[in-house]
Amino acid sequence: MTTSILQDRAMLATLHISQWTNRKHDKTVSAEVERNHQATDAGRYNKQLVDRASLESIAKVASAARAYHYKVTLPWGDNGDRLLPGALFMDYRNEMATFKGRFSSEVSAFLTRYPMLVQDAYKRLGSLYVATDYPHVGEMRSRFAIETSFAPVASGNDFRVNLNDEYVDQIKREINERNAALQRASVVDCWTRVRTVVGNIHERLSKADNKFKDTLIENARDLLDVLPALNVTGDPELAKIEKDVRDLLVPPQRLRDDATLRSETARKAEELLARMGMSGQSLSLETA
């Protein structure tokens, strides 16, 4: 697929999440430990400034937002950009707006408790307590954020710097070659996700005494819900295997109650794994 076609089908999405670390390096204690043990460069003592549990709800929202971001995007380079299919943009924007709202609410709740948490820390830390370790409430709010940004997929044809034609052509080729490699990597990522959910189904269902959670099937369903959109390169083999994986989406309780159905589903999963083998990766490298 050419970059120009990909530019029509997808964009780059970046997710930035910041949170207060709730840690502070105590140089005095670190030096004291080294003196007591006659050690050098032995480590760092980091204080936990407030009760860890007070930040858990914020961390959970951040983790869920990050998981969703990775679920509906594909890898694209190593600078934090991810490839977001245009077909998923509206869902992405709405979901992220929800995450941002939840995140803001949890941060506000934390800030309401923050003065009391600092007082508790004064008692808990004893002589390790240092007032300047704790930002003011107004500054603390700025330590938390969920931000998203979007950009078009770059193309060699977009490069228009005033240079010698020879250098311009070379840079354009390098950009297009890099894009081609990134496209291949994005398709391989799709195949890896498919193999993972099918492999998990086979592993858990192949033995009658293996227990499994409902998420075994739910995770596969979640992937298939976005896989057609993630297949931005139009890989026909990926589209074909997606339909076959849907046959594995049997209600979990039926699989627990019906040994024959469970065995048959495990067999289908095994056949799909055999069909994919390493072919999923090789096919995607050829068709990307």
Give the positions of each predicted feature.
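Leu/Val/Ala/Ile-rich N-terminal alpha-helices, chiefly Sec-type signal peptides and the beginnings
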Residues: 1-141
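Charged, low-complexity, helix/coiled-coil-prone segments
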Residues: 3-4, 25-53, 158-170, 177-192, ...
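Amphipathic, heptad-repeat alpha-helices with coiled-coil/zipper character that mediate oligomerization
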Residues: 51-75, 138-154, 185, 189-192, ...
